[in-house]
Amino acid sequence: MISLESQVLERHLSFFDGKSVLFAGGISDNFPQTLASKCPSIQIWSCHFDYARTQSAVNFSVEFQGQADLIVYYWTKNKQEVNFQLLQLLAQAPIGQEILIIGENRCGVRSVEKTLAPYGEIAKIDSARRCGLYHFSLQNKPHFELKNFWKTYQHSTLENLTIYSLPGVFSAAELDTGTELLLSTIDNKIKGKVLDLGCGAGVIGSMIKKRVPNAQITMTDIHAMALESARKTLSENQLQGKVYASDVFSDIEGKFDLIISNPPFHDGIDTAYRAVTELITQAKWHLNQYGELRIVANAFLPYPELLRQHFNDYQVLAQTGKFKVYSVKN
């Protein structure tokens, strides 16, 4: 089944006839493959590993190099990520580049007119399925350099660590209160192999490595910008660790003494429990004997019942009015 956005694009198949096409942004289906007979070449650029790993020939990366007759961009709720990717695409495209931008109204696609107005002509050409479709023609190329998009921050809790982050990464500009509470439970009793799952900019794994130098740190995420941020946070703070893409446990190698996470529960603009459900239900298969799963979550979320089902019991290591840190042992 194709997405609402792709259903709207199906109403405009003449745009694709005989053209090389680049799909980018928040694409989540196999619509590009259905165009194989119409288009001499199709490229897909995604920064989301949960999509990239399920499709063939997807370029999963922070930066993309390549051109096409037509670019199709799927708008997402993450405005910083959208701007970052669109500026990249415009900077390397030729004058006159044709771009279709499609997105759900609730994700803010209407703001594309203001976003792209400085760079060319944009017009809305369709409205259906609660989506808007826009046609853009490039007239004024922007300048793009990755180094200009890095943000950094420090925090008293982080003991002189500097956190590096790219656009679209969770808590990119400051330490969030949930992670801060989770960090308050980290002490020198932690040892062995540690997995920071859903690592974002690498705050948790880097902090553990700083406090417990002998810990073996692995950090994973589904977001290309998060992985690049975590690598830079480690390297700029002279810390060592593995960083790679995994959709929860899809690509996890080996077992761990501690799996620690501030797991996401927002998917775009919807609340989604898939990732944290997989984390809790599958963690025991990735923990060593007596290994621990430790997560922070909003206090209202129904995780205690899930933890009991799969680990018999749990402890609350720290809590505030909004967050709780849960711990279970294998």
Curated annotation (Swiss-Prot):
GO molecular function: 16S rRNA (guanine(1207)-N(2))-methyltransferase activity; nucleic acid binding
Main EC class the enzyme belongs to: transferase
Protein's UniProt keywords contain S-adenosyl-L-methionine: yes
EC number: 2.1.1.172
CDD domains tied to this protein: AdoMet_MTases
Cell compartments where the protein resides: Cytoplasm
Pfam family, one: MTS
Recorded catalytic activity of this chain's protein: guanosine(1207) in 16S rRNA + S-adenosyl-L-methionine = N(2)-methylguanosine(1207) in 16S rRNA + S-adenosyl-L-homocysteine + H(+)
InterPro entries assigned: DNA_methylase_N6_adenine_CS (IPR002052), Mtase_sm_N (IPR013675), rRNA_ssu_MeTfrase_C (IPR023543), RsmC/RlmG (IPR046977), SAM-dependent_MTases_sf (IPR029063), Small_mtfrase_dom (IPR007848)
Subunit field text: Monomer.
Stated family: Belongs to the methyltransferase superfamily. RsmC family.
Protein name (record): Ribosomal RNA small subunit methyltransferase C
